[in-house]
């Protein structure tokens, strides 16, 4: 396949298993900045001054790819859910948050940064599956902090086959993709500040028997997105085989879909019991070994599909499972260095790794409550259901920022 001429496309594209931006190879180090649209708003939670500072810091570091939640869904006052919400009820939108998303994309465009925007969430922290099921008449979604994750996961396993829930989501997709930015006058479908539409954050079937319906839903969703926007890339947002009930064939099939342009994987050693909270340093070698095995298997799939791979989430707690600013990050730094080395080594050899987004950006946040986010607190890289500081990289985390800068330099040499 011939490469486009310089400047032929203003959008990030894929050619022969690799990303192109402005006609050149595009390799990157990015981050997860889920709260960007809220920060860009002028209502509750909004802080445009902080947003500009965060974007400027990231830009100075060479971080130019941000993975962002379009918006949260549902009622407010749920302690484990992000607020303010964007979609209050199906088809009822909070214009303040929409303005925040517009502002964010405008500011990113000024800095030649690009966004990966995810539209749904299998987890409770932004509504997602549970929100759509409730409004499809499936009953009240359990709250994991009160009812436990098994009850929640059993409930949302219905989503894969609930056509009414899908239709409500598709209405939302059409609304968002049909939007025009109020500040720039540019339609979202024409905005080069958007790299990719992502179906969801870690979409899962939540049950092996739900996998066929899950695959069909992803195919429908990607086809809808493609029909609405022929300019931007589309991705699933998957964790990898972990998000497919450890069915590797399922992962390969969802990535093979003609409307899916590239593959995603996530890595969470602590969440996946590869590392224990009281042995984070001691368990790092095992976490690294499992990480390499997981990555290698997914790279093999990407080679068969000839599609790029992005390590779109990865994180590691602070030493001794601390959360406060200034606490040690030796284990995290070691894990980041290892993941970065695997990504860069493969990319330098012409492999399918194209980039990575660490989780997540805490930046200039000053958390007030470690154990739980409360309304009025600064947003961090940790959503409302998690301890504030658990996986966040703050502006004061000098050793971690040094590791990130080193990777940025390495990846930019490939451009």
Which residues does each predicted region cover?
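Bacterial Sec-dependent N-terminal signal peptides
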Residues: 1-8
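Active-site mouth of glycoside hydrolases
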Residues: 9-309, 314-414
């Amino acid at each position: 396949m011939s490469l486009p001429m310089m400047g032929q496309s203003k959008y990030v594209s894929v050619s022969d298993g690799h990303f192109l931006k402005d006609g050149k190879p595009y390799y990157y180090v990015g981050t997860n900045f889920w709260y960007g649209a809220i920060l860009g708003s002028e209502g509750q939670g909004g802080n445009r001054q902080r947003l500009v500072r965060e974007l400027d810091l990231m830009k100075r570091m060479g971080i130019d790819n941000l993975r962002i939640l379009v918006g949260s869904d549902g009622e407010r006052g749920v302690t484990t859910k992000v607020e303010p919400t964007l979609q209050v009820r199906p088809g009822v939108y909070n214009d303040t948050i929409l303005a925040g998303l517009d502002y964010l994309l405008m500011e990113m465009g000024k800095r030649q940064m690009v966004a990966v925007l995810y539209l749904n969430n299998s987890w409770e922290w932004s509504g997602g599956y549970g929100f759509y099921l409730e409004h499809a008449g499936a009953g009240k979604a359990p709250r994991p902090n009160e009812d436990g994750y098994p009850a929640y996961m059993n409930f949302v396993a219905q989503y894969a086959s609930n056509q009414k829930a899908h239709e409500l989501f598709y209405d939302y997709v059409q609304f968002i993709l049909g939007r025009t930015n109020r500040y720039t006058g540019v339609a979202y479908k024409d905005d080069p500040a958007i790299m990719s539409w992502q179906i969801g954050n870690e979409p899962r079937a939540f049950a092996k028997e739900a996998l066929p319906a899950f695959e069909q839903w992803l195919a429908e969703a990607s086809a809808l997105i493609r029909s609405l926007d022929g300019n931007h890339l589309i991705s699933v947002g998957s964790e990898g085989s972990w998000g497919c009930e450890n069915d590797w064939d399922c992962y390969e099939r969802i990535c093979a879909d003609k409307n899916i342009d590239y593959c995603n994987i996530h890595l969470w050693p602590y969440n996946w019991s590869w590392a224990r909270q009281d042995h984070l340093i001691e368990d790092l070698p095992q976490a690294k070994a499992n990480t390499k095995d997981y990555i290698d298997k997914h790279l093999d799939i990407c080679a068969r599909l000839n599609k790029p791979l992005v390590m779109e989430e990865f994180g590691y707690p602070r030493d001794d499972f601390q959360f406060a600013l200034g606490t040690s990050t030796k284990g995290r730094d070691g894990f980041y260095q290892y993941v970065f080395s695997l990504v860069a080594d493969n990319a330098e050899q012409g492999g399918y790794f194209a980039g990575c987004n660490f989780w997540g950006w805490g930046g200039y946040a000053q958390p007030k409550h470690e154990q739980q986010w409360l309304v009025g607190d600064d947003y961090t890289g940790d959503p409302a259901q998690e301890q504030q500081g658990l996986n966040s990289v703050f502006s004061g985390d000098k050793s971690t920022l040094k590791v990130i800068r080193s990777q940025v330099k390495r990846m930019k040499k490939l451009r």
